[in-house]
Amino acid sequence: MGKKLFGTDGLRGRVNIYPMTPEVALRLGLAAGTYYRRKSHRSRVVIGKDTRISGYIFENALTAGLLASGMDVFLVGPLPTPAVSFLTANMRADFGVVISASHNPFYDNGIKLFDADGFKIPDKAEHKISEMILDQSHTWDYPDPSSVGRAHKIKDALGRYIVYLKNTFPSTLSLEGLRIVLDCANGANYKVAPLALEELGAELIKIGTDPNGLNINHQCGSLFPEYVAKKVIEMRADIGLALDGDADRLIVVDEKGIILNGDQIMALCAQDLMRQNKLPGNILVATVMSNMALEVFMKEKKGALIRSNVGDRYVMEAMRKHGAMFGGEQSGHLIFREYSNTGDGLLAALQILRIMKQYERPLSSLAGLLQLFPQRLINVNVKQKRPIETMPTLLKTIQRIETAFSGRGRVLLRYSGTEPLCRVMVEGESDSKVNTYAEELADIVAKSLAE
């Protein structure tokens, strides 16, 4: 086994190839159960999953390990990642588990853990659990046969989550009169999102609500918002909403078919929260990938943009550290801390719809707050992940480009925490310069890390 199990968002990989094997899942159940089991009470864990066919494999393997460790297991079935975060706290569980590979294709899967308050578990807990999994000589502290866990299917989990979501939307408003194109990516939100939005009065045009175990994220969802954009124009809809496979991220399309990224939505929501005095210190947390225009926008509003590492768990860590109530990622993870401890695509959609209803204005006129700096992101496939500082040619090129920008541009290189990729991002005021520099850097990265 390799030394590192957990990436930036838990375990993830191709099904039946290490680490995404039944054996690892079983040991993970034993390890997590051992770590979180409490002698003071009957310990319990909530397990949810998305719609991948392989979910059955890992659900059963994890359950076996958890039961053997003495944990009671509450199975909620296919539900969004943020629903499991909510239910873990709501049901007073000791921790929660989500089986999902988010926006990845069906042949991948993953496992991520939440603590008792619905936060993604910290690095320290991941490290301890990893140690137990990787140590093949580890002796498990099995409980007495009379103290092993019991498994329960929770039939009202979906209803509990819908009630919670609807309570984040003002009771004085409804979605009547709004035509919404909704793409659920054939993923975890295929039931919840249509039910919640229709109960609030919306007219829906649905895409990606017929999962078969193999079609999750397949030419649908947040990675393919152009399909939603096309449908918005065709159906003359007011807005398009594209979720990913586990429904923790959201991409929005306005009534003109223009695709809005997370930075533009963060500006809209941050301004709304500032108007309500619900953004303490006017602090917004975003990642190193967010556009410089968002930084400029917050300064103009006498606020501050605090940048974190990539990953909604790191956004939340920065939010907790700085007392921020709102944060997110350019990729569409949005965290409204008043309501949730993790990114929630549908909850974010409800906040945007509320703003549209309250101001009685089309989304295009509300979301045009940012003049985005030209930005180019190139994902380079790599066979190794050498530290950037050990590649002198690359470092010299970065230094030359940053000097040329004179403080009006940025260069960012980072390895994906879940895929064999190096992400090369260049941002500046000139489209042509940004593209030239990005391609130059990507070429150096490709040549340096191809073997």
From Swiss-Prot:
GO cellular component, one term: cytosol
Protein name in UniProt: Phosphoglucosamine mutase
Family per similarity comment: Belongs to the phosphohexose mutase family.
Active site: 102
Co-factor binding details: Binds 1 Mg(2+) ion per subunit.
Binding site for Mg(2+): 102, 244, 246, 248
Pfam families assigned to the protein according to its UniProt record, in alphabetical order: PGM_PMM_I, PGM_PMM_II, PGM_PMM_III, PGM_PMM_IV
UniProt cofactor(s): Mg(2+)
Primary enzyme class: isomerase
BP GO terms, sorted: carbohydrate metabolic process; peptidoglycan biosynthetic process; UDP-N-acetylglucosamine biosynthetic process
Function: Catalyzes the conversion of glucosamine-6-phosphate to glucosamine-1-phosphate.
